[in-house]
Amino acid sequence: MVNMKASMFLTFAGLVLLFVVCYASESEEKEFPKGMLSSIFAVDNDFKQEERDCAGYMRECKEELCCSGYVCSSRWKWCVLPAPWRR
């Protein structure tokens, strides 16, 4: 009975270890393309867009900084399209 408990514990510990190793290697694989793409498409300060005076659709807003045609959502703090239920 003790051997069965020990073997079940070792099997479970092995599965947990396998899961951790697979998760770690997968997360490293996900970071590699992101790092490569960010270095390829790195934006220089000369090419950055100028900041707008107002925030566009789905941009973060504070008080009344949304562009015309949009309203600041009180719940999400994003600029959204005005609708009758958002008055």
Swiss-Prot record:
Keywords of the record: Disulfide bond, Ion channel impairing toxin, Knottin, Secreted, Signal, Toxin
Signal peptide per UniProt: 1-24
Source organism, top-level taxon: Eukaryota
Localization terms from the record: Secreted
Entry GO terms, CC: extracellular region
InterPro entries: Huwentoxin-1 (IPR011696), Huwentoxin_CS1 (IPR013140)
Principal localisation: secreted
Tissue expression remark: Expressed by the venom gland.
Propeptide residue intervals: 25-52
GO molecular function, one term: toxin activity
Disulfides per UniProt: 54-67, 61-72, 66-79
Pfam families: Toxin_12 (PF07740)
Domain notes: The presence of a 'disulfide through disulfide knot' structurally defines this protein as a knottin.
Family (UniProt): Belongs to the neurotoxin 10 (Hwtx-1) family. 51 (Hntx-8) subfamily. Hntx-8 sub-subfamily.
Protein purpose: Ion channel inhibitor.
Name recorded for this polypeptide: U3-theraphotoxin-Hhn1e
